[in-house]
Each structure stands twice: as structure tokens, then as C-alpha cells.
Amino acid sequence: EKYNATDAERSYQEALDINSRYVPALVGIARVVGDERSLQRALAINPNSVLALETYGQLLLMNNRQEEADDYFERVLTLNPESLKTHSILAAQAALNQQDDEYAEHFARVNSFSPNNPKFLGDIADTLGNNYLFEEAVEFARAAIESDPNYWQGYTLLGNNLIRLGEEEEGKANLEIGFENDPFNVLTSNMLKVFDTLETYTTVESEHFKVNLSETDADILWPYLEPLLEEGYETLTSKYGFEPESPILIEVFENTEDFAVRSVGLPDIGPLVGICFGKVVTLISPDTLSANWQEIVWHEFMHV
């Protein structure tokens, strides 16, 4: 829950070393590493474990196995019609698919046993944000905080999605509120550390772009990057007949971990070297890459 996968995995393994049939630890391991076998074992021990069924459904959903996932969620609600997590998952899926009636049904059912539950709203905000619906995620995060101003995860969700929209000042302010009241949330802590890095960076601007980058990159890279960006803007807006709202914010990071944290909140992002959030693009400095950086810049701008 605090995005500290390393410590969580170690703690779950220590519990399993004591009792290898301890279902919550088997489920916990599965949540951390995505291990289906641990969930299968948990359900072999207790076929009616709501936690195991719920987690299995989430894992299947993440792997685009929607129909199988729905079967598990249906089993959960048969065992526990008031499962907040399952209702939030299904409500979020309905919101993603613009199934207003289905969303309203889950919202009403949750309100019947837990009115204005902030975690329900926060879970939906998290799902929407992870699916690049940042404005909608911001709305749900604000609603979660309005429901319970002491729901600190709501501030992290709000801040994270605001900065993906380029609203960095308000985003940072909300992250700081979240961190001050929940300092063990690794995602919040990581994001604020990236802001410390950005404070050492230089901001340069062109006609359609605002770019944050290190002083070294500002001296060496910017003379090449500025015409590349503006050429891309002119070419692609002409080609697609669409002019995005400007200035478009681009952040170029020297450190791959800073790039990963700014992009997803955690320091491991795999092989990705650039991400577009619509109004914001994050990139790794070409100093750290062997790939064609010009192609990467144009590719990410095409997503804008």
C-alpha cells in the first residue's frame, strides 16, 4: 500500500518461512511480484478467501484477461457483497468504458454500506490515472479528499495526476501534504525528491515548448533540441490538422531513476526512455542513451 515492494516481499517471505500455508502472506507475495502460483496455492488452502479471489481478479485484469477476472470478482461479491475493493475495481472499469449505469450501480451499492467512502473514490482515481485519464483522475481524487480530508493517499493521487497535467505547483503542494501526514509512502517521497532535482535544473522556452533540463543539457543539448521541437511541431500539426495547447512541458532527466520516478512514481521503469502524458513529456538525456534521441523526441511528440 505504501509502494515499498522490497520490504513488503521480504516481510511476506518471512511470514511464509514460519507458516508456508499462511494465506494472507501468499496473497501478499502475489500482489508484489504478480505470481499466479501463489494465488493458486492460497485458493487451494482456502477456496473462499476473498482476499485471494480479489487479488487473482486484479492480476487477470492487469493481463487483459477481462472475462476470467469478472468470474473471480463475481465470486468475491457472492461471498462478500460489501467488498469495497471489488466494487471500486468494477466501478473504475465501468468509468473507463463509459458504462454510466454500471458505474452508478456500484457507487450506489457502496454508498448503501459505506457512504462517501474516500478509498472507493481514491481507487477509481488511481485506475483512471494509470489509464492516462488524468483530468478525470483529478476529479475523483478531489472528491475523495472532500469526503475525508484526512485521507492522505488522496493528496498523493491528486498531486501525482496534477503534475502529469503540467500543474506542478499545485501538484507538489498536495504531495507535500500527503508526505507530511504519511511519510512512509514511498511514491510520495520519491516524487518530492524529483522536485528537489528539478529545482537544480534550468527552464528554457521556445514558441510552443517549455523545457526543464540540467545546466549541462541547457548549454549543449538545447541549441539542437529547440529547432528539433519546433520543426516537429510545425510538421506534425500540419500533418494531423491539430494544434495542442501550448506551451507543452518537456522534462529531460540526466538520471534514469529520476526519469522513472517523475514518470510513474517508482525508480524502475524498464526499457522506456520517453513518456507522453498529453500536456507533459518526460525524457532521458541523450547522454545516457544509445538510441536515436531525435526519433524518440518526435515519437513522444506525436503522442501529444
Label every model-predicted segment.
Residues N160-V186, K193:
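TPR/TPR-like (Sel1-like) alpha-helical repeat modules
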